[in-house]
């Protein structure tokens, strides 16, 4: 009985350890800018149909790759754990 409790406790700690490693590694990956494929339209300035299309494709890639929110303005596309609304 004691060995079963010990094994279960060990499994819990090991799973927590790996969850922390995965969370930390993905949080570092998630804050970096993603490489935007050349097929995406890179536009500057105010929101237009082209920049809205770019941000839509950017956010789709961001969620597909990291499951993170996206900050997109003009030609800047960044996946992060939070969205900075600094308008």
Curated annotation (Swiss-Prot):
The keyword Heme does not apply. One of its GO terms (biological process) is killing of cells of another organism. Disulfide bonds join 55-72, 58-77, 62-79. The keyword Chloroplast does not apply. GO terms for cellular component: extracellular region. It is found in: Secreted. Residues 1-34 form the signal peptide. It comes from the Eukaryota. Keywords: Antimicrobial, Disulfide bond, Fungicide, Plant defense, Secreted, Signal. Belongs to the DEFL family. This is Defensin-like protein 223. It comes from Arabidopsis thaliana (Mouse-ear cress).
